[in-house]
Amino acid sequence: MLLTRRAALKSVAVTSIGALTGAVAYGMGNERHRVGLTHATLPVSGLPPALDGLRIAFITDVHHSLTVPADDVTRAVMLANSTDPDLVVLGGDYVTGLDHHYVAPVAELLRPLHARDGVFAVLGNHDDDREMPAALMRNGFTVLKDQRTRVGLRGEALEVAGIRFWTRRPDEIARVLRDARDTTLLLAHDPRRVTEAAALDVSAVLSGHTHGGQVVLPGIGAVARRDFPVLAGVARRQNTSLFVSRGIGTVYVPVRINCPPEVALVTLQRLSDL
């Protein structure tokens, strides 16, 4: 049978639409709930030998809501605890759109998280500045709002600093990090803050916010891309190392394609020659 050009194009279009529909259906019904554990090695310049191999369980962008159920959050907590980490870090966006109905529930779901040397949290752009931090603190988390704390571990010290999402000016960030003498880990929801961190010679940054792109199409890449240094994984800016997690939840559309949710176990690796 002779196939006309119009018929061929129609066939390709139908096939493409069918494939996309199938991918979206899978992303809505399966992939967005398949929370997994990933491992990342983060090279850190000047890391003391005693802190080489320090393990940090990192959870971010939970977005607990009608479309991100308690079961997903509970699985993330279970995976983090299974790693027996030195530190636990939460990277912000615990709810979506400042929805106060989920503030107390998500903090309680995260409460079982534990680590030998502390559990720390920062806020994201979907978190309010009062209810969310109060709920986290009630459940045992140290919430860093443009603050820094010195953590003693393995006979050494690690400066853990955290900034609000809207803290962006170099002088504001410099104020948080002023007089930091030890290796500094900056918790910043937005990975674009690595620019300011690198200018201040911060050792390492942990971020979320990007969701890894959330929808990543073959041959196209992430649909929602901005000027992020990296959408997911490890990057380096001057002497500052950055890790960006894909996070747990979703926003805008309850779908993930080629971008599964993750709990990240980040292991610090000493780079003494940098």
Per-segment meaning from a language model:
Residues 54-134:
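Membrane-embedded segments
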Residues 1-19:
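N-terminal secretory signal peptides and thylakoid transit peptides that target proteins
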Residues 191-267, 271-273:
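Conserved beta-sheet core of the metallophosphoesterase superfamily
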Residues 44-56, 149-160, 236-241:
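Beta-strand-turn-beta hairpins that frame and shape the catalytic cleft
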Residues 20-54, 67-70, 75-78:
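C-terminal segment of N-terminal export signals and the immediately downstream linker at the start
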Residues 53-63, 157-165, 185-189, 241-246:
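Active-site-proximal beta-strand elements of phosphoester/diester hydrolases
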Residues 59-60, 88-92, 118-125, 144, ...:
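Active-site neighborhood of phospho(di)ester-bond hydrolases with catalytic His/Asp-centered motifs
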Residues 131-134, 138-141, 145-147, 152-188, ...:
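Binuclear metal-dependent hydrolase catalytic cores centered on His/Asp/Glu-rich metal-binding motifs
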